[in-house]
């Protein structure tokens, strides 16, 4: 493991997903899934998200589209919240999901809208 890349990834991951969420992911990891937490932090967040070629906002928009296409509702909710943290608006999220409907299918988009609305409701309730 490259410590500098891991540390950079940990910083970005906490900034996007929230410190509490990330700390909980590591706290609840066991011997079985800790290597996945380390891999995601170093390579996904440190190497990929840490590159300078795209802004965090743009990376969030791309992730929303890809995760919608893959039908990964849990991860989508995490990344909807992260996208909002990166300055993506609810209107921009809606536009991503409308494009998902055309290129990935209406069922994928319907599920994505459903997941996003749950995140929005949770955020609105916490205000």
Question: What kind of feature is each model-predicted range?
Answer:
Residues 99, 106-110:
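Substrate/cofactor-recognition hotspot
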Residues 1-57, 85, 110-127:
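Acidic, glycine/proline-rich low-complexity segments that act as flexible tails and inter-domain linkers
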Residues 61-94:
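Mid-chain, well-packed structural core segment of small domains
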Residues 81, 98-101, 117:
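Short amphipathic alpha-helical surface patches that mediate protein-protein
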Residues 40-44, 61-68, 96-101:
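Short alpha-helical scaffolding segments that buttress acidic/His motifs in well-ordered protein cores
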Residues 52, 70-73, 87, 104-107, ...:
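Residues at alpha-helix boundaries and short interhelical turns
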Residues 91-96, 111-114:
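A glycine-rich phosphate/pyrophosphate-binding beta-strand-loop-alpha-helix module
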């Amino acid at each position: 493991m490259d410590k500098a890349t891991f540390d950079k990834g940990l910083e970005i991951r906490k900034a996007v997903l929230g410190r509490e969420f990330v700390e909980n992911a590591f706290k609840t990891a066991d011997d079985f899934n800790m290597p996945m937490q380390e891999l995601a932090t170093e390579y996904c967040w440190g190497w990929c998200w840490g590159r300078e070629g795209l802004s965090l906002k743009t990376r969030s928009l791309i992730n929303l589209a890809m995760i919608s296409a893959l039908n990964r509702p849990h991860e989508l909710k995490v990344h909807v919240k992260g996208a909002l943290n990166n300055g993506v608006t609810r209107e921009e999220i809606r536009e991503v999901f409308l494009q998902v409907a055309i290129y990935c299918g209406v069922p994928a988009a319907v599920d994505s809208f459903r997941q996003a609305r749950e995140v929005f409701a949770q955020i609105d309730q916490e205000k």
